[in-house]
Structure formats: structure tokens, C-alpha cells
């Protein structure tokens, strides 16, 4: 079996969230981490939220009542080792709005999403639509051009087009009017069109926008 030295190896992996549910007024996040790992969410001006995964690595995190838009940094602690996730968990309007994981250069993971279009990400040069599927490849059309969506694991797909700006995105026959990037500097959450837009800075001097349709 593994020795103590093996268990203290650097392969402590960040938590992977795979869903959110509402239990009364409380948001409950579900996911996986290492067996018996301590999963922690840290946020500015908010007490850290923590739980311990079970022997299979599954965990449920119950968030306290939140107000406004809250950004959490997920991490895992195993013994003396900690792994901070490259993703930021964003809870919009205290959970009344979307719950999503954002990361520079990556398609946004919508924890509260359904089948269809979950998110549209842009860095000003390209536009990336993504969502989840029940197994069949979705039909995706951007500005009249049929796309070939790519499976990216965890039951999700993405389609990338080499241009940015407002667009009409149609997924399985349902159309969405993507409003384009936000102009804001810093971290901004705003209601735009029939959805929410998050704009945040990415290194070294760029920014990324994700739009989360209703």
C-alpha cells in the first residue's frame, strides 16, 4: 500500500465541483477531491467555508447566506499541503443568479446550468460558447455559421470562433443574443441583455468576459 511519504506527495489536487443545488435558502455545492481532503472556500470579507470529503473523495459544501456577488477561491488541504484552484467560484446575487467557475483562458463552468448554452467567454480576440449535453453533440450555429462543437469532458462541449463582438448563438434551435465584451476594468458583474456578464482581469494585461444567459 502507499506509504506516508507517498501520501504527502505534491499530487494534492484542487477540488472539482460538479453541481449546485438549493436547499431552502442555502446553496449546497457538490464535488470531488482527494479522499478525506479538507475543502475550503475563501473569499474577501467573508468567513471561509470548509468541509471534509468522505473516503471516496465526495463532498458537499453548504454556503452561508450570501448577499451581492461573491468570489470564492477554492482550495484543498491534505496534511501540510494545500492546492489552490486556478478557478474562481462566482456566486451572483447571493445565489439568486448564476453560480459559475471562471478561469483565465478556459470555458466557464456553469454549476447551475441546464442542457444547451451555459456560457460565452471572450478575450477580445476569440469567442467561445460552451455548455453541457446529455451525450449527443449539440447543434451550434454562430452568426449563421454552423460550428463543430468539441467534447471537453465532464459531459460538456465548446465551440470556438476566431472573432469577438456581439453575436447570435443558436444551440439546438434556441437562439441567444450575446451582447459582446464588457469594457470595465477590474472585476465587474453586471446584468446585460438576457443574462449576466462577468468581466475580470487576466495576466499580464488582458481581460476576459463571460456571459451567462438566463
Language-model features, listed with the residues they occupy:
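Ser/Thr-rich low-complexity repeats and stalk/linker segments
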Residues: 1-214
Amino acid at each position: 500500500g502507499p506509504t506516508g511519504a507517498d501520501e504527502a506527495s505534491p499530487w494534492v489536487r484542487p477540488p472539482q465541483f460538479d453541481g449546485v443545488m438549493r436547499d431552502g435558502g442555502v446553496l449546497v455545492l457538490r464535488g470531488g477531491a482527494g479522499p478525506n481532503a479538507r475543502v475550503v472556500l475563501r473569499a474577501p470579507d467573508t468567513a471561509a467555508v470548509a468541509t471534509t470529503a468522505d473516503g471516496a473523495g465526495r463532498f458537499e459544501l453548504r454556503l452561508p447566506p450570501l448577499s451581492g456577488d461573491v468570489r470564492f477561491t477554492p482550495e484543498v488541504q491534505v496534511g501540510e499541503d494545500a492546492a489552490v484552484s486556478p478557478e474562481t467560484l462566482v456566486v451572483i446575487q447571493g445565489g439568486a443568479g448564476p453560480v459559475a467557475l471562471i478561469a483565465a483562458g478556459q470555458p466557464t463552468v456553469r454549476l447551475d446550468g441546464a442542457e444547451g448554452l451555459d456560457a460565452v467567454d471572450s478575450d477580445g480576440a476569440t469567442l467561445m460558447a460552451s455548455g453541457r449535453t446529455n451525450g449527443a453533440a449539440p447543434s451550434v450555429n454562430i452568426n449563421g455559421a454552423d460550428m463543430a462543437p468539441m467534447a471537453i469532458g465532464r459531459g460538456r462541449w465548446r465551440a470556438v470562433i476566431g472573432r469577438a463582438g456581439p453575436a447570435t448563438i443558436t444551440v439546438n434551435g434556441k437562439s441567444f443574443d450575446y451582447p459582446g465584451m464588457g469594457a470595465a476594468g477590474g472585476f465587474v458583474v453586471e446584468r446585460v441583455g438576457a443574462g449576466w456578464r462577468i468581466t475580470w482581469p487576466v495576466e499580464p494585461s488582458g481581460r476576459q468576459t463571460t456571459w451567462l444567459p438566463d
